[in-house]
Every structure is written in C-alpha cells, then in structure tokens.
C-alpha cells in the first residue's frame, strides 16, 4: 500500500510542500473520519503540520464529543476557538491553571455529561453555581483547587445550586477545602446529592460535618433527639475523604450509613494530638465493614503538620479489624504506632484475598511479620512498607517468595542492605522498586541487572548515600533493552556528570529523571541529556517529561541555553534553583508557558507523599509531541530569552 508522507519544515510553515499537495488529493471526509479516532492533543499536533490538516482539524473540533487535555494549561485565547463552536461536547477534562471566571461561559454548557477541571485556583464559587444551573445531565464532576487564589471564595448557595441542579451525578469529587466555606452545621446540604451517586471524594471536610451528613435527627414525643441512620449516600460504593481528625464517631457513621460501600479511603493530618473523646480507638476499628462488602480500606494519619499518631489503637483493634475484613483485597494503614507484629500479622493471615498491603510508619513492625508468610495463601502484587525502620533483609527475603510482586515500596527502611537486592532481583514481574534511604551499595544494585531490570519501569534510590557513578555504568551499559521510564537519583552526594553520561549514552527512554540535591551534577549533564537521541527519528532529549535539577551544585546559566527549544520538546516539569539567575529562569518560564518551572524545591509531578490521587476517575494523558505546544504558542518569546541571556552576560563582563 502506498503511503502519504507529510514533509514539513520551518516550524510548521509548509506552503508548497509536496506532502500537503498529496493530502489535497484525499477527500476531506476521509481525513476527518480518521481524525475522529484521535484525542484533542493529537489533533492540535496534526493542525500544526500543514494547512490541509489544520482545516480538517478545525471542522472536527466542532463536533468531537471529548475534549481532554491535562498535560498543559491552556490560556483563554487558546480555549475559546477550540471549544466555542462545539455544541456536541459531552466530556470536558482540562487543566485550568491559566483560566479564571471569565472562562465559565466557554467551559460550562448543557451538553456536558462529564466535567473534570484541575487547578481551578482563579475560579470562584460561580463556577460551581453555573455547573449546577446549566449541566442538568451531568454524570461525573471533578473540580480541583477551586478558589484557592487569594480573593476568591465559595458560598453555601453555590454548593446548593450544584447539588440541586445535577440530579443525575454518579461521580462527585470536590478536591478543595470545604471547611473554609461551610459552617459547622452545613454538612447537611449534601442531603441534596443525587441518589445515583456511587463515588464521592472530598478534598477536606471536618469530621463533625461528615457525621452530620451521615446521620439525621428524628423528633418524636418522648425521645426528641434520637439519632438515626440517614439515607443520604446510601448507594455510594467508593468514599475518599480528608478530615481534620478520624474519630470513632465518623467511622461508625460511615459504616452504618453506607450499606453499599466497597472502597473506603479516609485520612487526617491533625494540628495537635487529639483528645481521647475525639480520636480513633480499638472500638472504632470494630465498627468498620458492618455490611461485609468492603474490599479496599485505607486509614492514614499523616504527620504533615504535627508528629501525631493513632495512639489509642492497639493490637486488639487489629484483631477486631481482621475479624470484619476477611474478604479484603487492599489494606493501607498509616500512623499506627502502638500496633506490633502480632496485630499486623493477624491482618495478613486473616485476609486470604489480599493483593495490596501497605504500612506507613510502623515503628514496631519487625521481620517477624513475614516470618511464616509461606504458610498463607496470599498472592501479593503490591507491598509498601514505608518508614518501617526495624525491617531488615530477612523480611524482604521472605516477602520475595511471592513471585507475583509488581510494586515494592521500601522507602525509609534504612536497615536494608545488598541482600535485599539479591532477593528482589529474582522477581520476574517487578515493575516498581523504591529504595530511598536504604544502606545499599553499587554492588548490590548490579544484582538487578541479572534479572529484574528488564521488567523494571520505576526505580528510586534517593538518599542511598553509599552509591557512586559505578552502579549507573553497570545498569546502563547498553547491553540490553530497558523498560525503565522513571529514575530518582536525588540526594546522592557521590554522583557526578559521568553517571548521566552513561545514562544518555545508553539511550534509555527515561520520561522522569530526578537529580535534586546532587551537588556534583552540573551543566555537562544537562547538555548530555539535551543531546540524547532515544529513537533515531526523534528530536534530541525527546523522552523526558520531568527533569528535577533543584539544588544541583554545578548548574549555571549555561544550562539554560540547552533548556530552550528544540531541546527537551516533551518537558512539562522542570525543577531548578531560582537563585542561579532569576531573570533567565523567568524568561524561560515565559518562553515555555506550558512548562511548569519550580524554583522553591517543591516535589514535581502528581505523586504526593501519601499517594492521594484520583487516577481512577481522571484520564491521565501522556505528554504529546512538541507540535501541540508549538501550535498553541507559536514562535513568541525567543527574543525575550535571548535578551535576558545577553543582559546576564553583560553583567558578568562588567563584574570581570
């Protein structure tokens, strides 16, 4: 079959090119039919190649049912022409980081059945209100960070408009702090929610509000304050909450009021140690899963604001939990400082269907938990033992007997040594291995090359301070094709540019590379990565979507020349030390507005410390080719960045 090749050059200016004339011979209807199979980001990429395809894309965008772009924040000037003509849009998923209230009329329309808007910091409650008034047939709604910008707010009326108007909602995720806008007694407004709701996720709400929502007060003759179970949310199967403090009362209310619950994820981050009457105890755990349908449970107490734990839960509470959770498939427990091996072991030996087991900060968890794991019928695929300081290699050797392990998170287990790597190197399905802070050596990591490295997709050795360049030369010697996509080499004091040369030379298609706080990494590493050709027909550095160079000691303004286009065309997140040269950093951010430049040491990407995400209802779209950004941005900004560099060079000359 003959193929038609579009040959384009000059940043998309293809007048007179042979490829465009060939495309003109094809019926527009044929091209448009093919384009209906593509997502919006791909359509925009096509539109940047030639006039024929741009014309077809323009027509397709008037009737495409789905508009999903999460990898870049679009401006109002870009969104308006893309969305305005489309009256058949049913699903809108967008990063609104550069939009505000002026975009409400463009975004909100009656035809929508799914809305997922992230980074809505510059929107007020008007966005929520308008969705309730216009989107009567909405099935899925996810709103993130609404009104977080100073001066924006959300009223109770806005939430009432939403819950009254969207009477067919099945999925509702309000990922912002509701407690800032609702009074203590306002939790009952959720009584207006659709009875079709099966998935509810709230960014933050007080335990008191949640308890009020799930209980109702009946007034009768002799018993004027009898509290009964509410029928609100009775069809909810998945509930994810962040509350001020997890208490027995809220756990009891959830268990008794949600008879259909399958998945419960609740966490808190108290500002101080809770009092006994307002904390979770053994009796609270006894209330979990009253209806016996729960398959997935996550109870996390974070130390984000204060070093506090579930101090009133003991091994007895774990015995209660194990008795009620025999059919559990996923269990995640964090902050249970009084629970010992006996408690955790009871969970493992009671839940025969368990496939995912996570313990965050288990200070009393030791190797004995896994001593006789072979006596169970467990088939674990995901295990996380983060910050369990008493674990040693012996525990991992026992755990590795489960050959179905795909994800192993051992971050903060500082007593693990090379014997751990010997054990995990024989796991044929292992895709994720996180070893932050472990006491491992170059020799230990070389064991991975003997087996598991071919399947490994993500590897983190952050803070493993014994490591040198040698392990990089061993792993990336080019002798085999690697599946590795994510690599965290942060806080390795002995890592130098030579290690990055080995990585670049191997051509490994890394999409996420973290080098923060590597003091010996400098400009040479950036140049090597920028010059990498992952595939023969790709642009240099084409695979990297995230690059974190924060606090790398050798980075100077020279690196910024290699961070401009055409280098790193897929880069969406960049971490850098702002003090290198603030003017050049600002110029780079203006030149590449869709590149999120972080200068304050924030962790990049969406992988939070506690893995609090909504990947199940968000469609994560892979970073597209640079044509998308090119189509949106054009050629603006080159001169501005060059001027900043020239000024910097002049200042340096004057100082000399």
From Swiss-Prot:
Gene3D superfamilies: Ribonuclease Inhibitor (3.80.10.10). The keyword Lipoprotein does not apply. InterPro entries: F-box-like_dom_sf, F-box_dom, Leu-rich_rpt_Cys-con_subtyp, LRR_dom_sf. The keyword rRNA-binding does not apply. Residues 20-66 form the F-box domain. LRR repeats lie at residues 71-96, 120-145, 151-176, 194-221, 243-268, 277-301, 310-335, 336-361, 362-387, 388-412, 413-437, 439-463, 464-491, 492-517, 518-551, 552-578. Keywords: Leucine-rich repeat, Repeat. Pfam families: F-box. Residues 632-656 are annotated as: Disordered. Signal peptide: none annotated. PANTHER family: F-BOX PROTEIN YLR352W, PARTNER OF PAIRED, ISOFORM B-RELATED. This is F-box/LRR-repeat protein 10. It comes from Arabidopsis thaliana (Mouse-ear cress). The lineage of its organism: Eukaryota, Viridiplantae, Streptophyta, Embryophyta, Tracheophyta. The gene is FBL10.
């Amino acid at each position: 079959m003959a193929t038609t090749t579009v040959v384009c050059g000059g940043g998309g200016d293809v007048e007179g090119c042979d490829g465009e004339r060939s495309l003109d011979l094809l019926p527009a209807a044929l091209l448009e039919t093919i384009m209906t199979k593509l997502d919006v980001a791909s359509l925009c990429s096509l539109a940047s190649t030639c006039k024929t395809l741009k014309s077809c894309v323009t027509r397709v965008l008037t009737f495409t049912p789905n508009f999903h772009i999460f990898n870049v924040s679009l401006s109002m000037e870009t969104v308006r022409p893309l969305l305005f003509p489309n009256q058949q849009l049913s699903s809108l998923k967008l990063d609104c980081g550069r939009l505000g209230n002026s975009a409400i009329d463009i975004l909100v329309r009656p035809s929508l059945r799914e809305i997922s808007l992230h980074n809505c910091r510059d929107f007020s409650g008007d966005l929520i209100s308008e969705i309730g008034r216009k989107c009567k047939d909405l099935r899925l709604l996810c709103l993130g960070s609404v009104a977080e910008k100073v001066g924006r707010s959300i009223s109770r009326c806005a939430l009432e408009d939403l819950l009254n108007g969207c009477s067919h909602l099945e999925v509702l995720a309000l990922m912002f702090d509701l407690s800032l806008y609702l009074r203590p007694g306002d939790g009952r407004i959720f009584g207006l929610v659709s009875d079709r709701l099966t998935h509810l996720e709230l960014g933050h709400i007080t335990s008191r509000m949640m308890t009020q929502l799930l209980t109702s007060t009946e007034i009768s003759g002799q018993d004027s304050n009898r509290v009964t179970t509410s029928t609100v949310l009775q069809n909810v199967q998945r509930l994810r909450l962040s509350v001020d403090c997890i208490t027995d009362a809220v756990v009891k209310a959830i268990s008794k009021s949600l008879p259909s619950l399958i998945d419960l994820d609740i966490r808190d981050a108290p500002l101080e140690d809770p009092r006994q009457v307002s904390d979770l105890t053994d009796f609270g755990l006894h209330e979990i899963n009253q209806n016996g349908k729960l398959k997935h449970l996550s109870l996390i107490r974070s130390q984000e604001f204060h070093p506090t734990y579930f101090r009133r839960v003991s091994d007895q509470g774990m015995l209660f939990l194990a008795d009620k959770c025999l059919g559990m498939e996923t269990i995640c427990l964090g902050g249970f400082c009084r629970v010992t091996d006996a408690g955790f072991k009871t969970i493992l030996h009671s839940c025969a269907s368990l496939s995912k087991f996570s313990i965050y900060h288990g200070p009393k968890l030791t190797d004995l938990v896994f001593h006789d794991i072979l006596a169970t019928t467990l088939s674990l695929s995901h295990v996380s033992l983060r910050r369990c300081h008493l674990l040693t290699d012996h525990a991992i050797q026992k755990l590795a007997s489960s050959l179905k392990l795909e994800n192993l998170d051992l971050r903060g287990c500082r007593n693990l040594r090379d014997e751990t790597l010997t054990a995990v190197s024989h796991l044929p399905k292992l895709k994720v291995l996180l070893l932050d802070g472990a006491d491992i050596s170059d020799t230990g990591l070389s064991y991975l090359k003997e087996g598991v490295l071919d399947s490994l997709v993500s590897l983190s050795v952050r803070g493993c301070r014994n490591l040198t360049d040698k392990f990089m030369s061993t792993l990336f010697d080019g002798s085999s094709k690697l599946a590795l996509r994510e690599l965290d080499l942060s806080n390795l004091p002995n890592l130098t540019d030579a290690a990055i040369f080995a990585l670049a030379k191997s051509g490994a298609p890394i999409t996420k590379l973290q080098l923060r706080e590597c003091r010996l990494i400098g400009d040479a590493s950036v140049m090597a990565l920028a010059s990498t050709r992952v595939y023969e027909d790709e642009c240099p550095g084409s695979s990297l979507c995230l690059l974190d160079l924060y606090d790398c000691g050798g980075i100077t303004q020279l690196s910024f020349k290699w961070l401009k286009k055409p280098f790193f065309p897929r880069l969406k997140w960049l971490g850098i030390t702002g003090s290198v040269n603030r003017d050049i950093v600002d110029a780079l951010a203006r030149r590449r507005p869709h590149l999120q430049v972080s200068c304050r040491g924030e962790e990049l990407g969406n992988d939070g410390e506690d893995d609090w995400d909504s990947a199940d209802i968000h469609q994560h779209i892979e970073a597209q080719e640079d044509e998308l950004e090119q189509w949106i941005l054009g050629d603006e900004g080159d001169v501005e960045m060059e001027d900043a560099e020239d000024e910097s060079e002049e200042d340096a000359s004057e100082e000399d």
